[in-house]
Every structure is written in C-alpha cells, then in structure tokens.
A protein has these predicted regions:
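Sec/Tat-exported extracytoplasmic proteins
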Residues: 81, 86-89, 96-99, 145-150, ...
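N-terminal export signals
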Residues: 7-27
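Short, solvent-exposed loop/beta-turn-alpha elements that line the ligand-binding surface or hinge
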Residues: 57, 123-132, 223-229, 296-305
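Pocket-lining segment of extracytoplasmic ligand-binding domains
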Residues: 182-277
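Short, glycine-/small- and polar/acidic-enriched structural segments
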Residues: 27-171, 175-179, 196-202, 219
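Solvent-exposed, polar/charged alpha-helical surfaces in well-ordered, non-transmembrane soluble domains
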Residues: 53, 75, 79, 93, ...
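Secondary-structure end/capping motifs
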Residues: 244-322
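Conserved C-terminal helix/tail region of periplasmic/extracytoplasmic solute-binding proteins
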Residues: 314-345
C-alpha cells in the first residue's frame, strides 16, 4: 500500500495542530446525536468536550447515548437512530463486511487500549505475571472463562487474535462470557470466581489493580503484543449519507473533539479533574496509572494515520472481523471531513 496520502495528511494536519484548535463561535445551535460504548477511556474526550463547553462553541447541542457493546453502536448508526458512532474500529470493519457502509471521520485512541485482565486467583495458581513470556500467558488462558463485552466486539477480537497466535481456537479452547460494560459488576464477577479474567478496555485494568481484584496480564497498547503496536482503535464514524446531509455538523463535532484532545495534552491538572468526573471509580493511584498509559495514545488531533490504519486492517483481517480484500484507507477514511475539521478556524 502506498502511503503518499499519509504524508500529505500529516503535513496538513501538523500545520493545523499548531493552531491549537481555536474556538469556533456559532450563532445557531444544531442538534446532533452520538453513541459510545460505556465509559471506557477512549470516549473521555467526548465527555470532556461537553464539560469544556466546546460543543456549545461549535454551535452543537449533543445528545449522547451509551451502549453496552460496539455492535449496538453500529446498529444505532446504520438504522439512523444516531448520527455519529464513537466506538472501536472493530465495529467499523464488521459493518463494512456486512455491507453496511460507514466512513471514518476522526480518531479517539491511537492504541489497542483493551487488555486481558486476570483475577488474583488465576495469577496465584499459574504463577504467571505480565512479565512472563507472551506464549506462556496465552496458553495459560486455555480452558478458562474469559469475559468479553459481547459477540463481535473489540474485546472478542483481542481474544481471537491471541489464541490464533498460539494455534488455539477461542470457540473450543476457552469459554467466552458476555459481561457487558458495567465495571463494578465485572470486577465482582471476577472476584467471585465466575470468570477467570476479562478482555476489557481501560480504565478497568487500573481499577482492578488499585482495588486488588486482578492485574493486567496482556496489554497490547503497552507493547506486550509486538504485532499490535501503534494500531488505531478508538474512532469516530458515520454513514456516508449522513455525512453528505449533515457535513457541517459532523465537521463541527470532530473539530470539538480535536480541540479537546489538544487541550487535554496541554492541561494535566484539568485532565485529572475531568477524569474524576468522568469515572467516579477512579482513585488517584488509578488515575496516575491510567494517564501514564493513555496520554501516549491520546491523539493530539483527530486525524487517522495511514500506517496505523493499515495495521488495524491487517489485525482485523486475521481475526475475520474485516473482509479479506478492500477496505483501503482511501475507501474507508473520509479525509475531506476529517481535514476540514482539523483546519477549521
């Protein structure tokens, strides 16, 4: 795949970043509906943009619906129940494979921020830690009950990929348990022994560790799976017809997110304050651990890097979530909407 498009995007977006996403004053208010999966950290900018008044600055009245899985976000987008999906790229590839057209219009997280988190009981029994060899860790998952948010999710995709690396079959060699997105309930389920571990997004890893319920066992965004480094995961997407009909509103939304991402990088104290508001389960030690992992993969602007996209595409082809052909960067990423959002003054 030639990445000349990426270089052009990078130069334009880099110049736009220098402008630090100035406020956009709008006289009229436009209503827009969005969806997201629970309150994982990828969607923190969605919350922060509202708290900072950036939607209002952009002339938007944003209604947010939280869903228990990315599959449900995708269903809401393609059924016109919401205008924009804030989700994982897994859902986008799954929709495209099912011939339900959508386009990427922005980025929320430039790392696979889903971890395998295992219970203290499992760790004690196996004597394994995150520092153990990757294949030893994957093989130790054989026969275990592993929680996922739901079928077809990014949490399932991670389990599928890891098992494939070890020559295992996740449908035969493990029991995948649908646990939804309620973090407190998931931790209680793991503590009680009803599941041995869970595949789940940040900040659950940090909450589990600070509450002494379990520990991060395999953390792709932190480099534990070399082949998964630097692939985009948190994304913003919409249907092509919605983009065509509501382009100014979508540009304004992505701009507000980009402005928020830039702000969070510049204001660590306010970022901590907003994280406490976003997720009341986060203690100060959990926030410390979360920020150390999250800030390196939080975009400084909402562009989508072509190399990062290509890595995500190959991952999802291997796991069967993306079709074996097509889905090129040019086909899936709406660079016009994305760059207009970045360049908006």
């Amino acid at each position: 795949m030639k990445l000349t498009r990426k270089r052009a995007l990078t130069s334009i977006a880099g110049a736009a970043a220098a402008a630090a996403f100035p406020a956009v004053a709008r006289s009229a208010t436009t209503s827009i509906s969005i969806g997201q999966i629970g309150n994982s950290v990828a969607f923190f900018p969605v919350f922060a943009a509202k708290s900072l008044g950036y939607y209002k600055d952009a002339g938007l009245d944003v209604t947010t619906t939280s869903f228990s899985s990315g599959t449900l976000v995708g269903t809401a987008v393609t059924s016109n129940s919401i205008d924009i999906g804030n989700s994982v790229i897994t859902d986008v590839f799954a929709l495209l494979k099912a011939n339900r057209p959508v386009k990427l219009i922005g980025s929320l997280c430039n790392g696979y921020y889903v971890d395998i988190i295992m219970s203290n009981q499992f760790l004690e029994a196996t004597k394994l830690t995150r520092a153990s060899k990757l294949m030893d860790k994957i093989n130790a998952l054989k026969g275990k009950k592993i929680g996922i948010t739901g079928p077809g999710s990014g949490t399932q995709a991670l389990v599928d990929y890891l098992f494939q690396l070890a020559g295992l079959d996740p449908t035969r060699d493990a029991e995948l348990v649908n646990v939804g997105v309620n973090q407190a309930a998931i931790l209680q389920t793991m503590k009680s022994g009803r599941i041995d571990g869970v595949s789940f997004a940040w900040p659950l890893t940090m909450i589990a560790e600070t509450n002494n319920v379990g520990k991060g066992f395999i953390e792709p965004a932190e480099g534990d799976v070399p082949s998964m480094r630097e692939q985009i995961q948190g994304v913003i997407y919409a249907k092509p017809d919605v983009i065509a009909k509501r382009k100014p509103a979508l540009i304004a939304y992505v701009h507000a997110i980009g402005r928020t991402e830039a702000y969070l990088h510049r204001n660590s104290g306010k970022t901590r304050e907003l994280l406490k508001q976003y997720d009341g389960a986060l203690s100060d030690p959990a926030i410390d651990a979360l920020l150390a992992a999250y800030m390196p993969v939080l975009p400084k602007q909402p562009d989508i890097d072509a190399n990062s996209y290509e890595k995500a595409l190959q991952f999802h082809r291997l796991t069967g979530f993306a079709g074996p052909a097509g889905n090129t960067y040019a086909d899936v990423v709406d660079t016009d909407t994305m760059l207009r959002a970045i360049r908006t003054k």
